Amino acid sequence: MTPDLVARFWLVELHVRLPAWLRGITSASASVAVKRPGSSKKPLEPAPQPAPYKPTHYRHIIYAYDVMEEKCEIPVLEHDPFDFLDPQKTLVPPENTILIDPVAVGLPWFSTMKGTPQCIHWREAEAAGLELIEQVMAARGAGAVIPEKLKTSDQRRKMMELVETAVTICIYLYAVSDAARIRVLTKSIVFLFLHDDVMESKANAEGNSILEGWDTDTFKANELEGESRNDIFLDFCREAIALDPVLGLELMQDTVRWARYSRVNSTKADKTHATWQDFRDFRELDIAYDFMITAVRFGAAILYDPAERPVFEWIEKLYIRHCLYINDLYSYEKEFREHQQEGAPLHNSVHMIEQVLSVPPGSAKAILRSVLWDCERQVREEYVRLMQLPELTHTQKVYLQRLIESFAGNYMYSMSTYRYARLSGKLIGPPPEDCLLKNYVQ
């Protein structure tokens, strides 16, 4: 059995658990004395067992961010249709992944989903992110505006933080991606972060970001032309479309559309929301709805006819809501601090609950956690309903599973990323030598 195949059984100490039935067989067989006819009565010593195989693909988790002030009992499910996420019940994880048990790793896990895949191509993702950010910094004089944070003396750490965040998003939310697709997805997230940081700072009045200046309505795969300052983005477009002419083009267009949306809404930093529904509708667009759905499909290489999308409309809506609730829960402390110190806008679910119900942040977080659990309940109900449809194709069923894996992956990203955990998280292990943030972790 090859090492890669053995790795798929993820017999990894600490972060992977053996199923109960397999542990029972192992312990029982080890205790049985082995005898041969005519041999002495002294039992033979069992042969030494090889050490558990540690897949070299595993990306170490350094931080654990416990966002809740009070512990809670996770709702118990009699039957879970998401057994494929449970490391106790799934011996073979999806292709290009290993399956991680968050509790065994040491994360303060409170999701009703039992585990999450991690993409084994994280080194390729890191290389792609670093390559892109170095290109952007080298081309600063070409006309595109870059974030203020990348102009400071602490520039290198900011660059590493941006890349680390993009990589952590991609290896958990789009875990089944192969090496080529994870490279494209990582670059797309870096582009979004660069643009978003420009929009949130005074630099947005200085000119266009690297994502602006495109007309997606007339943009075609064979018309990759633009101003010189967009050469870096053009290279990204060519890479994405060469890899996947259909989904690559969709991903690129959704990236540019969101950049245009955020430019328009950057002038509405003080926007208020009269109701929770009004706030949620705003945030669903603000979080790049179409891009996030396309990214899941791109990573999994799943095409479906636009006419099929209404079938998935509700579960995709729940996916976006779940993502924005998780994002708001874990980014609240960071965003609140930036709001106080820099005057940054504060459009956050925790803050909205505080205002609507006149409760302190801890209570608002507990309420949002309950909202998350209810969202997961609705997701399970819709997943079961869809999987029982006789007309659902195999490809459509695979897409649903990829979507659910991304649900769980967003928890893992949010709990362990340096972007959020550096302020309030705790170290759960020393950073390895190849860690991007080794020189900055404290």
UniProtKB/Swiss-Prot annotation:
Its pathway?
A: Secondary metabolite biosynthesis
List positions binding Mg(2+) 3: N327, S331, E335
What does the record say about the knockout? Answer: Impairs the production of aculene or any intermediates.
Q: Which reaction does it catalyse?
A: (2E,6E)-farnesyl diphosphate = dauca-4,7-diene + diphosphate
Keyword field: Lyase, Magnesium, Metal-binding
Which enzyme type, at the first EC level?
lyase
Q: Annotated Gene Ontology MF terms?
A: lyase activity; metal ion binding
Q: Which domain of life is it from?
A: Eukaryota
Which positions bind Mg(2+) 2?
D196
**So what does this one do?**
Terpene cyclase; part of the gene cluster that mediates the biosynthesis of aculenes, a unique type of norsesquiterpenes that contain a nordaucane skeleton linked to an L-proline moiety and are of mixed biosynthetic origin. The pathway begins with the synthesis of dauca-4,7-diene by the terpene cyclase aneC using farnesyl pyrophosphate (FPP) as substrate.
**The protein's assembly and partners:** Homodimer.
Q: Which family does it belong to?
A: Belongs to the terpene synthase family.
Please identify the protein, giving its name as recorded.
Terpene cyclase aneC
- Source species of the chain: Aspergillus aculeatus (strain ATCC 16872 / CBS 172.66 / WB 5094)
* Source species taxonomy: Eukaryota, Fungi, Dikarya, Ascomycota, Pezizomycotina
